[in-house]
Design a protein with these regions (language model features):
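Domain-level recognition of soluble alpha/beta enzyme cores
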Residues: 120-140
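Active-site-proximal alpha-helix that buttresses catalytic centers in soluble enzyme cores
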Residues: 2-85, 112, 123-126
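A generic local structural motif
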Residues: 38-41, 89-92, 118-120
């Protein structure tokens, strides 16, 4: 059994309105430009998600929307638990990960970065609009 996990940090968000709640911050111009390009890169590499778990924040949902030209009818689930998640929270969210296939999670830092570092055993930074593919072969 091979499971593949794509961990993605949302595209660049706007800080234009300082009164806006963090959860409601939208993507900025660069973020709206980058999301479709990341989708193209992911699909060109054959990283085709069969399930997407996405944070409930506006910027993560807009990131997914910006990738929709490649996602087609890929099922997705909005998960409020991904917003401000710790690595333990993210591991719990991933309990629904496909047993044999590719799951994508679109979230935030520091959670996304810590998750990648924890699962890979290596140090990686995750700027906005970064996606990382992790592979797992085995029974758990």
């Amino acid at each position: 059994m091979v499971r593949r996990l794509i961990v993605m940090r949302h595209a660049k968000s706007s800080w234009k309105d300082p009164n806006l709640d963090d959860h409601e911050r939208p993507l900025n111009k660069r973020g709206r430009r980058d999301a479709p390009m990341v989708a193209d890169a992911i699909f060109e590499r054959g990283w085709i998600p069969e399930l997407v778990l996405v944070s409930s924040s506006k910027r993560t949902l807009q990131t997914l929307e910006g990738m929709s030209h490649r996602m087609g009818k890929t099922p997705f689930e909005v998960r409020s638990g991904i917003y401000h998640a710790t690595v333990i929270d993210l591991m719990e969210e991933l309990e629904d990960m496909l047993d044999n296939g590719t799951t994508m999670i679109i979230g935030h830092n520091p959670g996304s970065e810590i998750l990648v570092n924890h699962l890979s055993g290596e140090w990686h930074t995750m700027p906005t609009a970064t996606a990382v593919l992790l592979l797992h072969s085995g029974s758990s």
